[in-house]
From Swiss-Prot:
NAD(+) binds at A33, E52, R53, G60, V124, H152, V153, D154, M219. One of its GO terms (molecular function) is pentosyltransferase activity. Glycine binds at R229. Involved in the biosynthesis of the thiazole moiety of thiamine. Catalyzes the conversion of NAD and glycine to adenosine diphosphate 5-(2-hydroxyethyl)-4-methylthiazole-2-carboxylate (ADT), an adenylated thiazole intermediate, using free sulfide as a source of sulfur. Its cofactor is Fe(2+). It catalyses: hydrogen sulfide + glycine + NAD(+) = ADP-5-ethyl-4-methylthiazole-2-carboxylate + nicotinamide + 3 H2O + H(+). Keywords: Iron, Metal-binding, NAD, Thiamine biosynthesis, Transferase. This is Thiamine thiazole synthase. The gene is thi4. NCBIfam families: sulfide-dependent adenosine diphosphate thiazole synthase. Belongs to the THI4 family. Pathway: Cofactor biosynthesis; thiamine diphosphate biosynthesis. Homooctamer; tetramer of dimers. Fe cation binds at D154, H169.
Length: 259
């Protein structure tokens, strides 16, 4: 029995890694923006992989507001909640409360059911770039425990037509690209202090491509563009993920036509 268990895990697990070593879109970060984008991209027929450094998904949703088990979503994001069949409760002034555990579960299930592949415990170490002027063409990654141990282990590659940084406050992928491929012309300015009403709108408006092949969604957008933070209101994250999917889909279609 033990041998069968081991061989089943090795065979099918390595088959998944092989299959998703080349994708249309590599999303880094399985938080609200990343999972939302993954679902809408997969629904449009794109091969999507989501890498999450933790062994769980949801990003900042789980702790709710200061560990109180509720988050807030505004009216504009209700259509996204409906797409994922997430229940919500009105509180007035166009605001609604949502259960964090339900939102995490349904965002992840929605992305998976649409065809996206989520791989947990992955630390993205670097990007692949091509051309002059350069464009981002994929990722280098190792398992998170390897990165945490400080061991020098060469990473593996994932080739992607588009890379979406949905890593949150630190914009980890874009930070790496800006430092190691300065020719991309990307700068991470860092987010500002809180102004929720303004930031919820700006994060959606500024979502999109930051360099050829490289995109930002969610709090990574705030980090790149120096926008205010917003706290435990998540409508902007959901809308940013949806907008990122729309922009990436459009770019991939246009790129395929040009190619």
């Amino acid at each position: 029995m033990e041998l069968k268990i081991a061989r089943a895990i090795i065979k099918h697990g390595l088959e998944d890694l092989y299959e998703y070593s080349e994708v249309d879109v590599a999303v880094v970060g399985a938080g609200p923006a990343g999972l939302t984008a993954a679902r809408y991209l997969a629904e449009r027929g794109h091969r999507v992989v989501v890498y999450e450094r933790r062994f769980s998904f949801g990003g900042g949703i789980g702790p709710g507001g200061n560990m109180i088990p509720k988050i807030v979503v505004q009216e504009e994001a209700v259509p996204v909640l409906k797409d994922f069949r997430v229940r919500y409760r009105p509180v007035g002034d166009g605001l609604y409360t949502v259960d964090p555990a339900e939102l995490i579960a349904k965002l992840a299930a929605g992305a998976i059911d649409a065809g996206a592949k989520i791989i947990l415990g992955v630390h993205v170490d670097d990007v692949i770039f091509r051309g002059d002027p350069p464009r981002v063409a994929g990722l280098l990654w190792v398992w998170t425990p390897i990165q945490m141990s400080g061991s020098h282990v060469d990473p593996l590659y994932t080739q992607a037509r588009a890379v979406l940084d949905a890593t949150g406050h630190d914009a980890e992928v874009i930070s790496i690209a800006s430092r190691k491929v300065p020719e991309l012309g990307v700068e991470v300015r860092g987010e500002k202090s809180a102004w929720a009403e303004v930031s919820e709108k700006l994060v959606v408006e500024h979502t999109g491509r930051v360099a050829p092949g490289l995109y930002a969604a969610g709090m990574a957008v705030c980090a790149v563009h120096g926008l205010p933070r917003m706290g435990p209101i998540f409508g902007g994250m959901l809308l940013s993920g949806r907008r990122a999917a729309e922009i990436i889909h459009k770019d991939l279609v246009e790129y395929a036509v040009r190619a």
